[in-house]
Amino acid sequence: MPKPIVAIIGRPNVGKSTLFNRITGGRVAIVEDTPGVTRDRLYRDAEWCGRQFTLVDTGGIATHQDDPLVARVRSQAEQALKEADVIIFLVDSRTGITADDEEIAALLRRSDRPVILVANKVEDFSDPTVTHEFYRLGLGDPVPISAAHGLNTGDLLDRVVELLPAVPAGEEGDALKVAIVGRPNVGKSSLVNRLLGEERVIVSDLPGTTRDAVDTYIRRGEREYILIDTAGMRRKSRITVPTERYSVLRALRAVERADVVLVILDGTEGVTEQDKKIAGYGHEKGKATIIVVNKWDLVPKDERTMDHYREAVRQELSFMAYAPVLFISALTGQRVDQVLMTIDAVGEAANRRVATGTLNAVVREAVLLTPPPSVKGQEVKIYYATQVKVKPPTFVFFTNRPEGVHFSYQRYLENQLRQAFGFEGTPIRLIFRRGRER
């Protein structure tokens, strides 16, 4: 079963993201002075005293603003309340109780979830009156902390652990991490929501609505996935807001920690230079990759349109011919069922190991069929090969002249391995080292 969920709830700018980062041990949520910078739910695993749980940083709940996203953020936070096993309600000890605090408290009192009231930004822990005001919220004893300095957060986590439900041993599966990347407004969040069957990620007509890399857990049958919905990646020259620049960096980091990368293209447009750069980043990091052409419902088409588009993708992204291409509509759900199945397939391919004996039988046959070209009149010999790692599958070939194996012959050997063992959706790495015949 999934880990228990602990949600941090509060109005904008009370320090939710700072606390989230403090507990999870790194700068995960974007922190700025702008109220409401966190607009989606961010998920990250945490541990305290041997107990593991998933921490959720929600967008700030504000009730008296004209921002069109406020209603959506509020809905997101309310959804987090439904999912959470424990709720941390964060208030600001400096500003005291506000109308938003009172409305959130009323919402929490109606909830059947255990709530820990936490007063953040406390400067003088020796002053017993610093939290007295918050008793009138009707949520028990406030816990004073300073998230920015890490003061008293240990006591808070002790309270959290006391309230966590027990997790049966051995029931937490290994979830496949899937980074969903692409230019702004190509439909990344819409695809996540379609896969989930609920609006978990804020979707808006405003480009760049998703500003963080948002982790979302889903389960299909016995398989678990973590979908990492990233901020749209623009060219560096177009990034002017500091928050957006940091979001793009986090999108790149999301690719680094992913098992599978979905590169989302806009089917109403061709493959752009930025699309190539985004896809290339996953390729360089050795990630299993799927090219997902979204908005296919909006494309005027005949019986050859899909083939023509696939050929164009293959031409523009020739460096990753191994990646399957899917044509979907996140809006209508067209062919979205293929996405998780393909994720499973490429994830398995990236983790595939080939027995040394089986591998060398294929290598011997390939070398007999097409021997490596000689270099300056000297014969190049391939003695044997072995697989040294997965994700991506990596093979070391031992030869008398490592520098003499031409890149075209390396490509030939790669094609032979793919023909024999599949590896659809994943890059494979070939390394050539000097060795002797066994």
From Swiss-Prot:
Q: Name one GO molecular function term.
A: ATP hydrolysis activity
Q: What does this protein do?
A: GTPase that plays an essential role in the late steps of ribosome biogenesis.
**Please, one GO biological process term?**
ribosome biogenesis
Q: Which residues bind GTP 2?
A: 182-189, 229-233, 294-297
An example of a Pfam family matching this protein is: KH_dom-like
Q: InterPro entries given for it?
A: AAA+_ATPase, G_ENGA, GTP-bd, GTPase_Der, KH_dom-like, KH_dom-like_a/b, P-loop_NTPase, Small_GTP-bd
Domain (KH-like) ranges: 352-436
Organism name: Moorella thermoacetica (strain ATCC 39073 / JCM 9320)
Q: Which HAMAP family match?
A: GTPase_Der
User: For GTP 1, which residues are the binding ones?
Assistant: 10-17, 57-61, 120-123
Q: What is this protein called?
A: GTPase Der
Superkingdom, according to UniProt?
Bacteria
User: Family assignment?
Assistant: Belongs to the TRAFAC class TrmE-Era-EngA-EngB-Septin-like GTPase superfamily. EngA (Der) GTPase family.
Instruction: Write out the entry's keywords from A to Z.
Output: GTP-binding, Nucleotide-binding, Repeat, Ribosome biogenesis
Record note on quaternary structure: Associates with the 50S ribosomal subunit.
Please report the stretch or stretches of sequence annotated as the EngA-type G domain.
Answer: 4-168, 176-351
